[in-house]
């Protein structure tokens, strides 16, 4: 909205307004807008969630120290998503289909998370939405992304560009790819996209178990993916760094900026001791958006490196459940991984800050793959 206002109308009367067409400037403006939106509306959102008694249901089989969190409002992810949506609509070029795909992903996965949170609150049951229904709708969202992105890729006039938008890029090697485009009807790409998005969504959700633990790594990874989207959306940088040039990705940078500002604004209230939790409505949507951006930029492997904390949390649950079913023994004292360290005697703040340090180091490592080709 504001992008169109400044670039297409006001610039006719005052030429400096045309600077808003710069992705770099709009990225900065988006961070500022989303950060201010989250911080300003945070107290009102928390007060409303308290008034309607949207309190967190704490599992009785988790760490005993978490029982003190009973009564803390949840579903704060609504604030994050609203901030992302508002700032994106303000500063992104809304003619770009990638922007709208990300907004639809945010709505679908956010709606599933909202339903899950609401059922937990209504029935005072931390299990929430029935797994079958939950994964059906998450699958719908992931398949929508895969199908939409493949359709856009298939409409490119240059077959080489279609392949660049579909094949899996292998970091560190300039010409190594996995030819997902080899399967007919985009099946390879769509199936792979399905697993990336659903895996990312659930991994972030599993990480969201301590005050501030998930949101700052989400910000770090969004920043890393923002660099990839900026580079791949600029033909000069893409050619120099040997990454696929995908023009649509320049506007994806704006969505990454919205996630950064909104996440930092939410952390203001989610830092220990948390005044509000994001809930599944935030975690599922943010994870799905990160996965979608990774697919859009063709940086799924770099994303797995940058989001290594999320991967470790998800794997810890898989290993714990698998080991218990097969051997009747636990691998960890408690899963997900952050609870294991709590059981070892680490304080919550120690776990969170140390995991943050690991997260930022992994993002730096992932960004290094840009140059090491």
Swiss-Prot record:
EC number: 2.7.8.13
GO biological process: cell division; cell wall organization; peptidoglycan biosynthetic process; regulation of cell shape
Classification via PROSITE patterns: MRAY_1 (PS01347), MRAY_2 (PS01348)
The protein's enzyme class: transferase
InterPro entries associated with the record: Glycosyl_transferase_4 (IPR000715), PNAcMuramoyl-5peptid_Trfase (IPR003524), PNAcMuramoyl-5peptid_Trfase_CS (IPR018480)
Reactions catalysed according to its record: UDP-N-acetyl-alpha-D-muramoyl-L-alanyl-gamma-D-glutamyl-meso-2,6-diaminopimeloyl-D-alanyl-D-alanine + di-trans,octa-cis-undecaprenyl phosphate = di-trans,octa-cis-undecaprenyl diphospho-N-acetyl-alpha-D-muramoyl-L-alanyl-D-glutamyl-meso-2,6-diaminopimeloyl-D-alanyl-D-alanine + UMP
CDD domains: GT_MraY
Pathway this chain belongs to: Cell wall biogenesis; peptidoglycan biosynthesis
Domain of life: Bacteria
One matching Pfam family: Glycos_transf_4
GO CC, any one term: plasma membrane
Mode of membrane association: Multi-pass membrane protein
Sequence intervals crossing the membrane: 28-48, 72-92, 94-114, 135-155, 177-197, 212-232, 252-272, 276-296, 301-321, 350-370
GO MF: metal ion binding; phospho-N-acetylmuramoyl-pentapeptide-transferase activity; UDP-N-acetylmuramoyl-L-alanyl-D-glutamyl-meso-2,6-diaminopimelyl-D-alanyl-D-alanine:undecaprenyl-phosphate transferase activity
Key words, A-Z: Cell cycle, Cell division, Cell inner membrane, Cell membrane, Cell shape, Cell wall biogenesis/degradation, Magnesium, Membrane, Metal-binding, Peptidoglycan synthesis, Transferase, Transmembrane, Transmembrane helix
Swiss-Prot/TrEMBL cofactor(s): Mg(2+)
Locations listed in the record: Cell inner membrane
Keyword Transmembrane attached: yes
Alphabetized PANTHER family for the sequence: PHOSPHO-N-ACETYLMURAMOYL-PENTAPEPTIDE-TRANSFERASE (PTHR22926), PHOSPHO-N-ACETYLMURAMOYL-PENTAPEPTIDE-TRANSFERASE HOMOLOG (PTHR22926:SF5)
Assigned protein family: Belongs to the glycosyltransferase 4 family. MraY subfamily.
Role: Catalyzes the initial step of the lipid cycle reactions in the biosynthesis of the cell wall peptidoglycan: transfers peptidoglycan precursor phospho-MurNAc-pentapeptide from UDP-MurNAc-pentapeptide onto the lipid carrier undecaprenyl phosphate, yielding undecaprenyl-pyrophosphoryl-MurNAc-pentapeptide, known as lipid I.
HAMAP family in alphabetical order: MraY (MF_00038)
Protein name in the entry: Phospho-N-acetylmuramoyl-pentapeptide-transferase
Native source species: Psychrobacter sp. (strain PRwf-1)
